[in-house]
Swiss-Prot record:
Disulfide pairings: none
Alphabetically ordered keywords of this record: ATP-binding, Hydrolase, Membrane, Mitochondrion, Nucleotide-binding
Enzyme class, spelled out: hydrolase
Record text on subunit structure and interactions: Found in several complexes of 140-500 kDa. Interacts with YME1L1. Interacts with COX4I1. Interacts with COX5A. Interacts with TP53; mediates mitochondrial translocation of TP53 in response to genotoxic stress such as mitomycin C treatment.
Consequence of changing T143V: Reduces mitochondrial targeting. Increased amount of unprocessed protein form. Reduces mitochondrial targeting
Gene behind this protein: AFG1L
Annotated organism of origin: Homo sapiens
Subcellular location: Mitochondrion membrane
Protein name listed in UniProt: AFG1-like ATPase
Protein origin, superkingdom: Eukaryota
Taxonomic path: Eukaryota, Metazoa, Chordata, Craniata, Vertebrata
């Protein structure tokens, strides 16, 4: 797999009221147990993730969690273990999804895609089980339950990846394949070539199970190839599990040329059951001990001096000198003005005003466990490009448990302002002219309403809030790994 994939390392080998709900398709019924008593002084919930890159050690979170991996036999067993240990609060909505994942876990036992080629696939008796598409609001535990499921899947050929990173990898593969084709001879028409099927075949040989976090479609280039790509993956026997903030019907809502995207929804539903996880609680915003002050307002007195002092204190613990650093990212150089060991001191301009992307932020996450990010502005539709980069940056930092110390112009809750200004309206008018769109036809498009950004901003605010907690800070300490 390409290095841009952010993979989950499986840790397991190392180490109420009678509410009922039914998963659409798999038929698994959930009967919620009475909530277990919570010990005094114990938090109801501890969010965690075991996602990391292949080259890094797993971000183990708690001794109880590791014990669960050693003694439990599936995601449902694991969930009950953590509840009894008062690491989690029993949530009937999560339990319903866990039961669906438990059923899929059992269905996957012994399943594998034959790697010998088309002939063996045609005569294989192993029919792939239906995957699962889990959707719901931010912070409800979608990523957590998928990570529990993933940790117990025993097949070797499995991948756990952020959906945005996966699509970046697909486009790179397409580009690489096209570059390898024979050049067109002068005077001859170039032969049309469809790279999607061979790319899907390539991915299928690498993974029988694909687990996607944050399944969302905002890019027209992605939208136009998804149906063909996933149709080929599914026909090759790949099983998909995905989490998303949106139901399948709302994917790429109001996007350009959405009519060409809609058939993908039917393909997704044909091969995946859908289940909603929506308890109405954002567990990332629960009351947990803060890790000191990690988020400053630029209007505060001496904020630069305070952050300088914090950097110096962390730098003293590093076996390195404070100096500029250059990281290599896919043949390019990513220059940082100030770093020391695994601590980097950056400005928003350095990381989000420049044309950087997920691969750059992933490389940062691999090299640094603590990053200072200064002078974050308030985001509106006028600076949506920088806002999207910031969202991608936080997603990568959060996935790899990078600790951040920030200064920003507004509190976290006010970082994203959904309001149109005159300059934004003028930019929209220019873009509408370039695309040949009328006012009426453009009114509902998400690229003009900012609808997709609003969904992503909600996730980012939720994650930034959790990143201020003592628990998150301790989990990001790589010196303990």
């Amino acid at each position: 797999m390409a290095a841009s994939w952010s993979l989950l390392v499986t840790l397991r080998p190392l180490a109420q009221s009678p509410l009922r709900g039914r998963c659409v398709g798999c038929g698994a019924w959930a009967a919620a147990l009475a909530p277990l008593a919570t010990a005094p002084g114990k938090p109801f919930w501890k969010a965690y993730t075991v996602q990391t890159s292949e080259s890094m050690t797993p971000t183990a979170t708690s001794e109880t969690y590791l014990k669960a991996l050693a003694v439990c036999h599936g995601p449902l067993d694991h969930y009950d273990f953590l509840i009894k240990a008062h690491e989690l609060k029993d949530d009937e909505h999560q339990r319903r999804v866990i039961q669906c994942l438990q059923k899929l876990h059992e269905d996957l036992k012994g399943y594998n895609i034959e790697a010998e080629g088309l002939f063996s696939k045609l005569f294989s008796r192993s029919k792939p089980p239906r995957g699962l598409y889990v959707y719901g609001d931010v912070g409800t535990g979608k990523t957590m339950v998928m990570d529990m499921f993933y940790a117990y899947v025993e097949m070797k050929r499995k991948k756990r990846v952020h959906f945005h990173g996966f699509m970046l990898d697909v486009h790179k593969r397409i580009h690489r394949l096209k570059q390898s084709l024979p050049k067109r001879k002068p005077g001859f028409m170039a032969k049309s070539y469809d790279p999607i099927a061979p790319i899907a075949e390539e991915i299928s040989e690498e993974a029988c199970l694909l687990c996607f976090d944050e399944f969302q479609v905002t890019d027209i280039a992605d939208a136009m190839i998804l149906k063909q790509l996933f149709e080929n993956l599914f026909k090759n026997g790949v099983v998909v599990v995905a989490t998303s903030n949106r139901p399948p019907e709302d994917l790429y809502k109001n996007g350009l040329q959405r009519a060409n995207f809609v058939p993908f929804i039917a393909v997704l539903k044909e091969y995946c059951n859908t289940v909603q996880l929506d308890s109405g609680i954002d567990y990332r915003k629960r009351e947990l001990p803060a890790a000191g002050k990690l988020y400053y307002l630029t209007s505060e007195a001496d904020v630069e001096a305070v952050m300088d002092k914090l950097f110096d204190e962390l730098a003293q613990k590093q076996n390195d000198l404070t100096r500029p650093r250059i990281l290599k990212v896919q043949g390019r150089e990513l220059r940082l003005n100030k770093a020391c060991g695994t601590v980097a001191d950056c400005t928003f301009e350095e990381l989000c005003e420049r044309p950087l992307g997920a691969s750059d932020y992933l490389e940062l996450s691999k090299n640094f466990d603590t990053i200072f990010l200064r002078n974050i502005p308030q985001f509106t539709l006028a600076n949506r490009t920088q806002g999207r980069r910031f969202i991608t940056l936080i997603d990568n930092f959060y996935d790899l448990k990078v600790r951040i110390i920030c200064s920003a112009s507004t509190p976290i809750s006010s970082l994203f302002l959904h309001q149109h200004h005159d300059s934004e309206l003028e930019q929209s008018r220019i873009l509408m002219d370039d695309l040949g769109l009328s006012q009426d036809s453009a009114e509902g498009l998400s690229m003009f309403t900012g609808e997709e950004e609003i969904f992503a901003f909600q996730r980012t605010i939720s994650r930034l809030t959790e990143m201020q907690t003592e628990q998150y800070w301790n989990e990001g300490d790589r010196t303990k790994k």
